[in-house]
């Protein structure tokens, strides 16, 4: 979010996010000294939300509506700092962030869930994937974590080369450059595919929160 800008309006919260916040406060009151197992806690909240009536949910939906109005109002008056964000993500040739172990797991299991539950919404699919992931043992998660670690390693090499190339090109535009960059782009194709899946998962996670 607005990492370096403390004046940026706080993001709007969904009805489900307000519900989770309420659950968390209830839990703190009942068990002030116990720590929360987030995977277990999220699962319980999700199950409880599904069983709630429209009337029970309406309270949280009203809270979300008023928070959205607050956010829209604040965003109208918000002026982002000069050179913020916009300049950062402009270069399409920059190496893309590698997917996490969870995103790799999602891209592998999502087609199966979609075929088993064709009418399932994007948000519910993401919830189901989150539940499946939290039920995996450390041994089951290992292959995804190893693959994610390799992709991260590759990304770190690519980003270092990309930055070095940027510095070099700032000083000179040599004709020998394109050959080197062509070699770089081939392995990046694979990474782009992974990244597309990651973006899709991130969208799903956002929808899940709403």
Swiss-Prot record:
Entry-annotated residues carrying Cysteine sulfonic acid (-SO3H): 23, 45, 106
Domain notes: Both, HMG box 1 and HMG box 2, show antimicrobial activity.
Primary residence: nucleus
TM regions (residue ranges): none
UniProt xrefs under Gene3D superfamilies: High mobility group box domain
Pfam families in alphabetical order: HMG_box (PF00505), HMG_box_2 (PF09011)
Species of provenance: Sus scrofa (Pig)
Phosphoserine modifications at: 35, 100
Record's function text: Multifunctional protein with various roles in different cellular compartments. May act in a redox sensitive manner. In the nucleus is an abundant chromatin-associated non-histone protein involved in transcription, chromatin remodeling and V(D)J recombination and probably other processes. Binds DNA with a preference to non-canonical DNA structures such as single-stranded DNA.
Superkingdom field: Eukaryota
SMART domains: HMG
This protein's name: High mobility group protein B2
């Amino acid at each position: 979010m607005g990492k370096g800008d403390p004046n940026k309006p706080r993001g709007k919260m969904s009805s489900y996010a307000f519900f989770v916040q309420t659950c968390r406060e209830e839990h703190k009151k009942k068990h002030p000294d116990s720590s929360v197992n987030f995977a277990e806690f999220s699962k319980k909240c999700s199950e409880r939300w599904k069983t709630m009536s429209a009337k029970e949910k309406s309270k949280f939906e009203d809270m979300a509506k008023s928070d959205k109005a607050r956010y829209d109002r604040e965003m109208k008056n918000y002026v982002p700092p000069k050179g913020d964000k916009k300049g950062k993500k402009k270069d399409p040739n920059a190496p893309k962030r590698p997917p996490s172990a969870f995103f790799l797991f999602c891209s592998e299991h999502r087609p199966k869930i979609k075929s088993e539950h064709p009418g399932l919404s994007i948000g519910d699919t993401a919830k189901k994937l989150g539940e499946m992931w939290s039920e995996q043992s450390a041994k089951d998660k290992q292959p995804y974590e190893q693959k994610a670690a390799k992709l991260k390693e590759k990304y770190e090499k690519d980003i270092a080369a990309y930055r070095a190339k940027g510095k070099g090109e700032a000083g000179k535009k040599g004709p020998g450059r394109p050959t080197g960059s062509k070699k770089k782009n081939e392995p990046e194709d694979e990474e782009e595919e992974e990244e597309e899946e990651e973006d899709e998962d991130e969208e799903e996670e956002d929808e899940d929160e709403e």
